[in-house]
Amino acid sequence: MFPRTYAVLGSTGNCGTALIENLLKTPDARIHAYCRNRPKLLQILPQLEESDRVTIFEGNIQDAELLQSCLRNCHAVFLVVSTNDNIPGCHLAQDTATAVIQALQDLKRNNPTSTVMPKLVLLSSATTDSQLSRDVPSLLRFILHRSASYVYEDLVVTEKLLHAQKDWLTSIFIKPGALSVDIQRGHALSQTDQDGPLSYLDLAAAMIEAADEETGCYDMQSLGVVNTNGKAKFPTGTPLCILVGLLRHYFPFLHPYLPMNTGPR
């Protein structure tokens, strides 16, 4: 297999680090890790310091020149800039997608004959998809949707934005259920089902599989991920995340006074 370069936008998050760990297992994969804080990334994954297969791009997502350098000649781009906190007015996913679209448009305009567009793989959620969440009890889905309402609205708008580019950009929408920081057990992609809790490592492996699929059967599709060798452990931080998220949904003025960085542990 010829060498492939993968860009990971949101490298310091649980999904971003899991993507890098999985990609490092593939000898011919090169990684462009985009982050705001290089020391934080190296603290999480110190092996990157000496790796000649990883290039770290430190900066804001609005740095057009840096982002173009990160995306140039990539096989796939993983859009995993997100938050577990239900922040009122959240637009992290929208900002990332908008910046990526603009950067790729600029690359294409500057090199119209030689620029090959990468596949974009967006981390979304099964809660936003009626098909993938059809087996979730209605009351639970009601609670889950409101506990991350601002984040989900951001994702819904982002998906529409990416769908609007389908004449020149291919996107894939990965929509897992509950996520957990746990070991890798085995996964399968599904267009009809999701199964949680799912480990971030299994999620990352599924995202890479979708990006590498060559027949195009996953292009512009929403995909769930199911466990194939047992579920991940229960994410202990999730109950607090749901509670605080509900408070932010119903009482957004409390946002500055509520804890941050809640979510799966």
Swiss-Prot record:
Keywords: Monooxygenase, Oxidoreductase. GO terms for molecular function: monooxygenase activity. The keyword Transport does not apply. Its EC number is 1.-.-.-. InterPro entries: NAD(P)-bd_dom (IPR016040), NAD(P)-bd_dom_sf (IPR036291). Disulfide bonds: none annotated. It holds the Pfam family NAD_binding_10. It comes from the Eukaryota. Pathway: Secondary metabolite biosynthesis. Gene3D superfamilies: NAD(P)-binding Rossmann-like Domain. Belongs to the avfA family. Oxidoreductase; part of the gene cluster that mediates the biosynthesis of the tetrahydroxanthone dimer neosartorin, which exhibits antibacterial activity. The two different monomeric units appear to be synthesized by the same set of enzymes, among which the Baeyer-Villiger monooxygenase nsrF is the key enzyme for the divergence of the biosynthetic routes. The pathway begins with the synthesis of atrochrysone thioester by the polyketide synthase nsrB. The atrochrysone carboxyl ACP thioesterase nsrC then breaks the thioester bond and releases the atrochrysone carboxylic acid from AacuL. This is Oxidoreductase nsrR. It comes from Aspergillus novofumigatus (strain IBT 16806). The gene is nsrR.
